Amino acid sequence: MARILNIEIPNNKRVVISLTYIYGIGKSLASEICKKANVDENTKTAELTEAQLSKLREVAKAYTTEGDLRREVTLNIKRYMEIKCYRGIRHRKGLPVRGQSTQKNARTRKGPRKTVAGKKGK
């Protein structure tokens, strides 16, 4: 297995797909990295030479990925909650942040239903 940005990427897959195993790199960014490194997207990771791997590492290092990206995202969410903007309030309440309706849906974000006891002796 090749190692890029301290992540083991699979050898049996194409380079573009293998790069997506790194948090913060999707398909479009992976193909962009391959173009900058002059590596064919369709070659398998196992077939890459050490020079090509080092070029991929060098190009991928320029992007925010893995721990730095996770930290940045969590700090952004904390900042939203501190300044009490709409998104921060939704995060704090555990409700959907991006405008989805919550009257009938949003069970994943709200958690399981809290049942209310009905009237006795009908």
Swiss-Prot record:
GO biological process terms on file: translation
One Pfam family it belongs to: Ribosomal_S13
Entries under InterPro entries matching the protein: Rbsml_uS13_C, Ribosomal_uS13, Ribosomal_uS13-like_H2TH, Ribosomal_uS13_bac-type, Ribosomal_uS13_CS
Gene Ontology molecular functions: rRNA binding; structural constituent of ribosome; tRNA binding
Region annotated Disordered, chain positions: 94-122
GO cellular component, one term: cytosol
Keyword vocabulary terms for this entry: Ribonucleoprotein, Ribosomal protein, RNA-binding, rRNA-binding, tRNA-binding
Biased composition (Basic residues): 106-122
Ribosomal protein in keyword set: yes
Claim: Transcription regulation is one of the keywords in the record: no
Homology family: Belongs to the universal ribosomal protein uS13 family.
Oligomer and partners: Part of the 30S ribosomal subunit. Forms a loose heterodimer with protein S19. Forms two bridges to the 50S subunit in the 70S ribosome.
UniProt xrefs under NCBIfam families: uS13_bact (TIGR03631)
HAMAP family to which the protein is assigned, alphabetical: Ribosomal_uS13 (MF_01315)
Function: Located at the top of the head of the 30S subunit, it contacts several helices of the 16S rRNA. In the 70S ribosome it contacts the 23S rRNA (bridge B1a) and protein L5 of the 50S subunit (bridge B1b), connecting the 2 subunits; these bridges are implicated in subunit movement. Contacts the tRNAs in the A and P-sites.
Protein name listed in UniProt: Small ribosomal subunit protein uS13
Organism: Mycoplasmopsis synoviae (strain 53) (Mycoplasma synoviae)
Gene name for this UniProt entry: rpsM
